[in-house]
Regions:
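Flexible loop linkers connecting adjacent transmembrane helices
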Residues: 8-34, 57, 63-67, 81-119, ...
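Extracellular/periplasmic helix-exit of transmembrane alpha-helices
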Residues: 84-96, 205-222, 235, 265-266, ...
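Extracellular loop-to-transmembrane helix junctions
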Residues: 1-15, 60-98, 285-292, 328-331, ...
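Alpha-helical membrane segments and immediately flanking helix-loop junctions
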Residues: 28-61, 87-91, 96-111, 123, ...
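N-terminal alpha-helical transmembrane segments of multi-pass membrane transport
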Residues: 1-49, 59-66, 77, 408-436, ...
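Helix-loop-helix module between adjacent transmembrane segments
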Residues: 1-2, 44, 76-98, 109-145, ...
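Membrane-interface loop-to-helix entry segments
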Residues: 1, 5-17, 124, 132, ...
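Long, low-complexity, intrinsically disordered cytosolic termini of multi-pass membrane proteins
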Residues: 429-534
């Protein structure tokens, strides 16, 4: 996907910064949250205990080299996240009340139907929704297990260490307060928690590295050497790679599809903007946070005492933090609590989206799921680490299978959407929302009636401009008409000048095709090239 999108995570850096600031989104645009809030929600589900406990598990099982595999998978995962978020925004459903239904289950069903694979889309979409419910419980169990473990350990109370379910009950109550407020409530909580927990945790990690600064060169050398040698229970390069990729998948979620759900709720008219936003998630998660966590563990040498099978996850990271001061693991406890809490909120939303897809929006089903999630938090706090990791890995793998298969078939749609947006942006046909009262910004707010009227007026003017462009192109005898090949991503379904206006990106894509000549017919991952109709 990285090659197919021509390294967009690198070339799209400037545009992504503008998108995150809400420069191209108006408050009256369809959606519920800003692009930044969607980014914070997804990061809350990825930058969490997968970075703290997951990296500790990876280093214990596969040695220091597993950390570099996590980082490598994170870089490659940027394009996968772009694809998921773009498709999630493109094929979302907007209900009458303005709420959003989106995610892989929707783009698998509707996206595959649009290219002639309707039955396959229905099967994959339904399967993904079922697996997402399992994945939500898997995340629930893992997060509460590790939060309860480190809180009990930090307290020094033998009573709490023997009754971690009590801590699980407290966590469950706090989660219940937030999730019964819906997606906007979740977005508000995560967008506030995310910066605070990131700052606290990163400062702690830097402190550990500075205290053990003399060991940094040796630690980096061990990581590079460990990429190809491996050690312990998962010895060998294949074993190290598997462990690293497993933990990266559990950590950054690239390929799992959750980005499609988080970004489907964003206020935007351009699906590609969400791809440009989501691409940062694996970079922040796997390359920055995971790598720094791994370095902090390796420089202290605490991983050498792990036997692999009996690894304690987050407690290994806490042991590394104790090299700074005896009280320092308390700061990690605070960060873990915030990480785990925000992740629980994010996956509660994902599970509800899946259930809504399967059964429609029925309060009885949604409330039952929320109650079961709260009960699951209590169960997870008392379960063994090995059990919750096994369940979480299995559920995430099941989610990834239909999602990655669907993205393979929809690869052309993704490229057309992203390239079309870039061309329109360069051509000036996508204008920034300069009025601060109309722009979404970092945090979404509902528009006033006056703002809605102004936005609708601008939208009517834009539609008229596109209609004029449509008629002009229709009158051009050299411009291609209806595609001869169903699902062709480079031909424009022009129809007649009175039909609905096609996506401007299709016009620009055809111009790209024409400029490349007849020999420029592309062939994507899912099939053959384009054909022009006479």
């Amino acid at each position: 996907m990285t090659v197919w999108l021509r390294f967009q995570p690198i070339s799209g850096f400037r545009a992504s910064m503008q998108v995150i600031r809400g420069k191209f989104s108006a408050r009256a645009d369809p959606g519920e949250v800003s692009s930044f809030q969607a980014l914070a929600t997804e990061l809350s589900g990825t930058v969490g205990l997968g970075n703290i406990a997951g990296v500790a598990v990876a280093v214990s099982l596969g040695g220091p080299g597993a950390a570099l595999w996590i980082a490598a998978f994170g870089v490659l995962g940027m394009s996968m996240k772009m694809a998921e978020a773009t498709l999630g925004s493109k094929f979302r459903e907007i209900r009458e009340d303005g709420s959003i239904q989106g995610g892989p289950m929707v783009y698998l069903r509707d996206g595959l139907a649009s290219i002639g694979y309707r039955r396959l889309g229905v099967v994959l979409g339904s399967a993904y929704a079922v697996f997402t419910v399992l994945g939500a419980f898997g995340a629930d169990l893992f997060q509460t297990n590790q939060v309860a473990a480190i809180v009990a350990d930090s307290s020094g109370s033998e009573f709490l260490q023997g009754n971690t379910w009590l801590l699980g009950a407290v966590i469950a109550a706090l989660v219940g307060i937030a999730i019964f407020g819906g997606v906007t409530s979740i977005a508000r909580w995560t967008s506030r928690i995310m910066p605070a927990m990131a700052i606290v945790y990163m400062l702690c990690v830097f402190a550990v590295i500075v205290v053990n600064l003399d060991n940094v060169p040796a630690a980096l050398g061990a990581m590079v050497e460990g990429v190809f040698t491996g050690e312990g229970i998962a010895g060998g390069v294949v074993g190290v790679a598997i462990v690293g990729i497993q933990r990266a998948l559990f950590s950054n979620g690239a390929g799992v599809g959750t980005a499609g759900m988080a970004h489907s709720a964003s206020k935007t008219k351009h699906p590609a903007t969400e791809g440009l936003t989501a691409m940062w998630e694996p970079l922040i998660d796997s390359v920055v946070v995971c790598m720094l966590t791994a370095i902090a563990i390796v420089v202290t040498g605490k991983h050498l005492a792990g036997s692999g099978e009996n690894t304690e996850g987050v407690q290994l990271t806490a042991s590394a933090f104790s090299t700074v001061a005896d009280w320092f693991p308390l700061l990690l406890t605070l960060a873990v609590a915030l990480f785990g809490y925000s992740t629980l909120l994010a996956y509660a939303y994902y599970g509800e989206q899946a259930l809504t897809y399967l059964f429609g929006y029925k309060k009885s089903i949604i409330y039952t799921f929320r109650v079961l999630g709260i009960v699951g938090a209590v169960i997870g706090s008392a379960a063994s680490l090995d059990a919750v990791i096994a369940f979480g890995d299995a559920s995430f793998f099941l989610m990834a299978v239909p999602n990655i298969l669907g993205i393979y078939f929809l690869a052309k749609v993704v490229r057309l959407e992203i390239f079309g947006f870039n061309r329109r942006l360069c051509a000036g046909s996508i204008e920034a929302v300069e009025d601060e009262d109309l722009r979404v910004g970092l945090v979404s707010e509902d528009p006033t009636p006056e703002q809605t009227q102004r936005a609708e007026k601008e939208e009517r003017a834009e539609k008229e401009r596109l209609r004029t462009l449509h008629r002009t192109l229709w009158d051009d005898p050299h411009f291609p008409v209806r595609a001869a090949h169903h699902g062709d991503d480079l031909a424009s379904p022009m129809g007649t000048p009175d039909e609905p206006i096609p996506d401007t990106g299709q016009f620009l894509a055809v111009e790209e095709r024409r400029s490349e000549g007849d020999g420029g017919a592309g062939s994507g991952p899912a099939g053959g090239g384009s054909h022009r109709a006479d």
